[in-house]
Curated annotation (Swiss-Prot):
GO MF annotation list: RNA binding
NCBIfam families to which the protein is assigned, alphabetical: nusB
This protein's name: Transcription antitermination protein NusB
Subunit structure comment from the entry: Monomer or homodimer; in equilibrium, with a preference for the monomer. Dimerization may be employed to package NusB in an inactive form until recruitment into antitermination complexes.
Organism: Thermotoga maritima (strain ATCC 43589 / DSM 3109 / JCM 10099 / NBRC 100826 / MSB8)
Known function: Involved in transcription antitermination. Required for transcription of ribosomal RNA (rRNA) genes. Binds specifically to the boxA antiterminator sequence of the ribosomal RNA (rrn) operons.
Length: 142
C-alpha cells in the first residue's frame, strides 16, 4: 500500500511529467487534474507546495542536476529521469523534515517503476552526489 506521502510524490512527478508534453498549460492546473478526492487535505497541500517550490527554483534545480551529468545534458535525459531528479532535488534542498535516505529511496522507486532498467541506478548516483554536496547540514542528522 502506498503511503500518503508516496502518493503525493507520485502526483507531483506525474504533473511534472505531463507538463513536458503540455507546455502551454499551467503546471499547477495539471496537478489539480491529478489530485482527486482520494488525496487527503495534507497531501494536496504538500503537492501544491512542492509544485510551487519546483517552479520557483527550476533554473537552480536544473543547473544543479546538470553539474552532475557526465557527458549528458539535462535535455537528453529521459522525461522520467529528468523529472524524478527535479522532484527529488527539490525535496533534498527545501523539505527540511525529510531524511536524505527517504528522498533518495522514493526517487529510486519512482524511477524503477516508470523509467528504464537503468533509471534507478542512474537517479541514485546523481542524487547521492547532490545530497552529499548540497543538502542542508541538518538533514544529515534526521
Amino acid at each position: 500500500m502506498k503511503t500518503p506521502r508516496r502518493r503525493m510524490r507520485l502526483a507531483v512527478f506525474k504533473a511534472l511529467f505531463q507538463h513536458e508534453f503540455r507546455r502551454d498549460e499551467d503546471l499547477e492546473q495539471i496537478l489539480e487534474e491529478i489530485l482527486d478526492e482520494t488525496y487527503d487535505k495534507k497531501a494536496k497541500e504538500d503537492a501544491r507546495r512542492y509544485i510551487r517550490g519546483i517552479k520557483e527554483n527550476l533554473s537552480m534545480i536544473d543547473d544543479l542536476i546538470s553539474r552532475y551529468l557526465e557527458k549528458w545534458s539535462l535535455n537528453r535525459l529521459s522525461v522520467v529521469d529528468r523529472n524524478v531528479l527535479r522532484l527529488a532535488t527539490y525535496e533534498l534542498l527545501f523539505e527540511k523534515d525529510i531524511p536524505i535516505e527517504v528522498t533518495i529511496d522514493e526517487a529510486i522507486e519512482i524511477a524503477k517503476r516508470y523509467g528504464t532498467e537503468n533509471s534507478g541506478k542512474f537517479v541514485n548516483g546523481i542524487l547521492d552526489r547532490i545530497a552529499k554536496e548540497h543538502a542542508p547540514k541538518e538533514k544529515f542528522e534526521l
